[in-house]
Amino acid sequence: MLIPRRVKHRKQHHPSRSGAAKGGTQVTFGDYGIQALEPAYITNRQIESARIAMTRHIKRGGKIWINIFPDRPLTKKPAETRMGSGKGSPEWWIANVKPGRVMFEMSYPNEEIAREALRRAMHKLPCKCRIVTREEQF
C-alpha cells in the first residue's frame, strides 16, 4: 500500500474538491492513460486495487505508471461516540484528484489489451474517468 514514510502533522484539514487540475493533465510517460472527469478522494487501497487489475490483465511486456500518491490523512471517530472531544484518529490516506488529472499511465504494444486493462482499473475507482491516448491530446 502507498502511504507516506513520515509526515510533519498527523492530522490535516480536508482538501478542497472544487476546481480543475492545474498540472498532470496530459499523458507524459506512457501511451495510454486514465483521466478523471470529476473530483474524488482516492484511497491507497483503491489505487492498489486498480494497479493489480491492470497488471493481472497485461501479464508481461507492458509498463504502468501511477501518477497520484495518497499523501493526505482522513480521520474518523469511532462508532457510537458522542460529539466533541476532539478530532478522530487517522483512518485512511487519500489522494485528492480533480477533474482532468491523469492518474494512471500505461505503455503496451497491443492497443486492445491496454484499453481493456485500463477499463478494468477504471471500475475500481470512485469517480467517472475516461481513457486518453498520447495522440489524442495534441
Swiss-Prot record:
Annotated Basic residues bias: 1-16
Domain of life of the organism encoding this protein: Bacteria
InterPro entries associated with the record: Ribosomal_uL16, Ribosomal_uL16_bact-type, Ribosomal_uL16_CS, Ribosomal_uL16_dom, Ribosomal_uL16_sf
Molecular-function GO terms, alphabetical: rRNA binding; structural constituent of ribosome; tRNA binding
GO BP annotation list: translation
Xref: Gene3D superfamilies: Ribosomal protein L10e/L16
Keyword set, alphabetical order: Ribonucleoprotein, Ribosomal protein, RNA-binding, rRNA-binding, tRNA-binding
Keyword DNA repair listed: no
Region spans: Disordered: 1-25
GO annotations of cellular component type: cytosolic large ribosomal subunit
Family annotation (CDD domains): Ribosomal_L16_L10e (cd01433)
UniProt keyword annotation of Ribosomal protein present: yes
Transmembrane region(s): none
Alphabetical list of HAMAP family matching this protein: Ribosomal_uL16
Role according to the record: Binds 23S rRNA and is also seen to make contacts with the A and possibly P site tRNAs.
Subunit structure: Part of the 50S ribosomal subunit.
NCBIfam families, alphabetized: rplP_bact (TIGR01164)
Protein family per UniProt: Belongs to the universal ribosomal protein uL16 family.
Record PANTHER family: 50S/60S RIBOSOMAL PROTEIN L16, LARGE RIBOSOMAL SUBUNIT PROTEIN UL16M
Official protein name in the record: Large ribosomal subunit protein uL16
Origin species: Rhodococcus opacus (strain B4)
